[in-house]
């Protein structure tokens, strides 16, 4: 007998988080990630682009979710024979950084930055760019993601910035860049314009004013146009009123004021909500008749513009009948529609709308009455002013969704600004075509959300009036007539005469000038910097320093990406900018495959908020339940279908309890069984793969089933991972683990322990080892820690030279299915057995008959003989699991079930029209049991010369009541119909008593912490239980076989033996008192 075994004892209750820490140390010791890259360097490349986060804040659950999905896909690709470079990236410029510095230094406007010095300001920004980089690295590593931080890219690096310049010059040279004045979303909080897609990121429900303002007509001060506005602060900039020329308008006499009001007829009820009879209609006319009529301006600030045609009625299609008065106040400096209609009517020049609001949202001196006042605070002052002058007729408010700055969280305004644009509208058709070439998961995000966004693209305002960013490389003359775009550091040196350039930020290059080629003196760089989204969209080029450090041949091997993945919000962010730049430069989609994940919400269903503290720290949850549990919880959720989900720690705990612990127990049981085999044989166990998969030699049907099931699983995982369907892969893997633990091991526990001989034990051990090993490998990209932990132990018994032997599980290849073992029929047959067992238990529970109590028989009812034949290998298992000595078969379902087919007359009428006549209706409504069986089996039936389908009927089955009374219970579920005979004779009752007795003994052994191999004696006292005593004595050998330990009357107790602590127990069996006590032998 061997005294030394291969494996050490495993923990009864594992500490998964602690084991993860051990695995992290192991990976560091063997340099696992770099080893994986080295081992696959000659494999075909699998290109992955990582979207760059800002390091000015800590990673949140959204980052960890996206990172987990990326890690799963990249690990799988690497284990599938691909070389997967995974470079981390950092967004280093833009509003997130500047906003932090402005808060830190108390900066409120541009002049304060200039006074401080751009160089000092940018130095402050640079100092915090990587503030949390080490924490990011630590947390990302802790969450099991293998990604290269040492070879990361940063958008502030000179090489990256130079590639961005090159990208931009390509677009400039193609005529896709222009400067213009447009009304754009503007952040007063950050003092800069935002792009249209940035405005989509932070909408909030707010209360805003809804005012009806009276504008005096020029010809009669007592006649007034009633206009609507929701932005009182724009009224000082009013230059026109806009109507819809097709609407019907009215002139009414107001009963209270005796003044005349003009507004759309359909909006009268809105003005006279409180006094329905408070007016009299004097005139009706079309809106077109109002065009050109003049009115008196509310404020005098732009009175001089009257000579340009201002302060008159214009027509515009954007005026609607569902709100307001049918007359809209027009301030062309603060509304896109206002601007366009004003330019179209020549009341302003395209580059000269009035904008009397400074960069931080305060009125300039032009608006003398409110100079220096913040616009939203001016609302109430303007309302008061108008009310005192009798011009405010309705002062109310309304709720609506309004965009806020994604960085400063202040309400945006729309403001006319001079900006630089990319002609995305010129790329629209190509963008739409390229979008169709990519493969998105889920599809709706591509075909719906993203396609809709592309259908409505506007030109991209990529310039920002900020400081910490990549400077736009355009040098211009004072009149903007001469424009030079720079595409490289060398070109900048050549044109400016600079000898050394070590940094491209504003403070390093803004002093450089270029001599004019047209006699205009010198050209100076424009003031603006790039929108940081332009930089992240340029990352395929920037991270490689293309085309300076990498040629086209090498770059084309890495473009487009094989895979990217981010949250659904990036459909209007990174996914979009990647596409715009890629389409502009190469007319190509920048990625082949994309997984879009949903948004992680707090447990209360609201957005996660640091200030509200409505979510737990990810590291805290990891320390409680494990990183693997968090990973599996998130990727087995609606999140991988791009849907929202509330993150609940209870869900993570459920993964640990319901998946990891049973899986661990299966693994532990395998280790214990191998140890038992080694002790029994005196040999060292070594996994024999060939023995485990040779189904011609596997005589046990459950062995064949679990091996074939595992091969089908391998095949399924490969197919679905090729489609990037994580939402299909994870549930199937979990289902397999459940089958492994709840069925295979439970049905074969005694074989695996050696109760059926060493040969059977070795066979079952090899089978169990095979499926645990293969399923662990399949799970390894998803849950890298627990799988590594299992594998490091299992590899001790994998023979040298085996394809399963590597230093780490993550160096192994994903298994390929053995085609000869792919057999869905075997799985289907086993599933039928499972369904019978599960439903029979349900029927027993319904009648409150304990599973410990044997029943007379179980009849399986199905009209198909093939169904019964498919169960022949599993009859013994059904008998054991249902606790019955007899399984009967019945094919005549009509004896037990009344079937009825109810035709869908409406559907059939629509399909057949007049052909669905009286005779056919009668035939359809009177199908025989045989007809219904034919319909169910074949899916159709011929009636009166017409073929009707199963979908044309509703099939009902009613179980005959005579089989659900007394000792009988009849029921059905799916294709399973069962009849239980719950009667018991004396022999069955006796077996039931024994089973209850042995069950209590086994529970006591487990409760006292005894191990299977402990030498013990079980003492029992049944002097007060004559029925149980008789039952035990009648089948003592079988009882001892179940207990596997000597069973001795308590009266013969050996006083010299040590009693097992807490093993003395008295319990009831069929109202008889029994006592047991256990001693060490």
Curated annotation (Swiss-Prot):
Binding site for ATP: 610
Any one Gene Ontology BP term: isoleucyl-tRNA aminoacylation
EC nos: 6.1.1.5
Motif segment ('HIGH' region): 53-63
Short sequence motif named 'KMSKS' region, residue ranges: 607-611
Superkingdom field: Eukaryota
PANTHER family linked to this entry: ISOLEUCINE--TRNA LIGASE, CYTOPLASMIC (PTHR42780:SF1), SOLEUCYL-TRNA SYNTHETASE (PTHR42780)
Protein name: Isoleucine--tRNA ligase
